[in-house]
């Protein structure tokens, strides 16, 4: 990058010196001067293509940082919807110091890969609350995605936290994602927790609310995770993870939200 700037500055100084010889300094480069500067820059970039890679990486990092800041600000603004929706399944103590919120789709392959990692964290963190935002983004493409999400919410309302988590884990344990999940898979997982479909609640309103919340947070894909203090969330203690992560990284985010470590 320094070499590029040197070339451009040299070109600029050259034409500025030419312009300085005139009676009045030029307000801008002439077409001929602009063409020459362009040729110099083009020749340099052709000889040093790694500069373009460096610039691209820097721009991408800047865009990701801006996106992260925007999502964090949205999380802080929408804390109540993230933490207090009684229609959303949760597991763990209601008075937990830290909450982990997951937006997921049962047919998402990266959600499936995240599931065992999250299960490890749940087992290792009995003092943390976990909130499960059913976000079936593949529902139109694969109907079982929506069906599994609705059944999960209905089990939560009818049977509570333990039954919901068992169902949730059982769906992922099938290993059936990306269109492979079947109605039989869903029925078997629901039957295992003694779910009564005849007395099921209407959960469309909850799904609509989750979809709206995801849009407000800037989440367009799954999985997406938010780790935050259950009270007093700020830009300094919130972690937003828009994608797959490991159990270790998730534990670090939990410690950060609890104030135990620096981010």
Which sequence ranges carry the predicted segments?
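C-terminal cap of thioredoxin/glutaredoxin-like
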Residues: 4-5, 22-38, 42, 187-263
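Sec/Tat-exported extracytoplasmic proteins
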Residues: 41-45, 49, 56-59, 63, ...
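Long amphipathic N-terminal alpha/beta scaffold segment
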Residues: 64-99
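Short active-site neighborhood of thiol/selenol oxidoreductases, capturing the structured segment around
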Residues: 91-108, 115-118, 130, 134
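Extracytoplasmic/secreted envelope proteins and their assembly/folding machinery
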Residues: 34, 38, 42, 49, ...
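N-terminal targeting signals for export/organelle localization
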Residues: 2-5, 14-78
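Structural alpha/beta surface segment adjacent to cysteine/selenocysteine redox centers
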Residues: 112-191, 215-220
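Active-site-proximal beta-strand/loop segments in catalytic clefts of secreted hydrolases
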Residues: 103-105, 133-136, 171-172, 228, ...
């Amino acid at each position: 990058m320094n070499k590029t700037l040197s070339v451009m500055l040299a070109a600029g100084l050259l034409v500025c010196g030419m312009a300085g010889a005139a009676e009045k300094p030029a307000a801008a480069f002439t077409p001929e001067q602009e063409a020459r500067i362009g040729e110099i820059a083009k020749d340099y970039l052709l000889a040093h293509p790694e500069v373009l890679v460096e610039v691209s990486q820097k721009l991408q990092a800047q865009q990701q940082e801006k996106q992260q800041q925007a999502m964090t600000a949205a999380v802080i603004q929408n804390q109540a919807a993230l933490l207090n929706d009684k229609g959303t399944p949760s597991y763990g103590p209601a008075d937990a110091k830290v909450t982990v919120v997951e937006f997921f789709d049962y047919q998402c392959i990266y959600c499936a890969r995240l599931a065992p990692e999250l299960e490890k964290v749940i087992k290792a963190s009995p003092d943390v609350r976990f909130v499960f935002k059913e976000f079936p983004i593949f529902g139109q493409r694969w109907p079982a995605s929506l069906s599994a999400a609705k059944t999960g919410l209905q089990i939560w309302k009818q049977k509570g936290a333990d039954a919901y988590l068992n169902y949730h884990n059982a769906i992922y344990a099938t290993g059936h994602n990306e269109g492979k999940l079947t109605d039989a898979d869903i029925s078997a997982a629901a039957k295992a927790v003694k779910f009564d479909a005849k007395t099921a609640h209407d959960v469309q309103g909850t799904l609509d609310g989750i979809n709206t919340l995801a849009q407000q947070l800037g989440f367009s894909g799954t999985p997406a995770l938010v780790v935050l203090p259950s009270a007093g969330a700020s830009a300094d203690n919130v972690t937003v993870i828009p994608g797959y992560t490991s159990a270790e990284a998730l534990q670090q985010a939990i410690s950060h939200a609890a104030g135990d470590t620096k981010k």
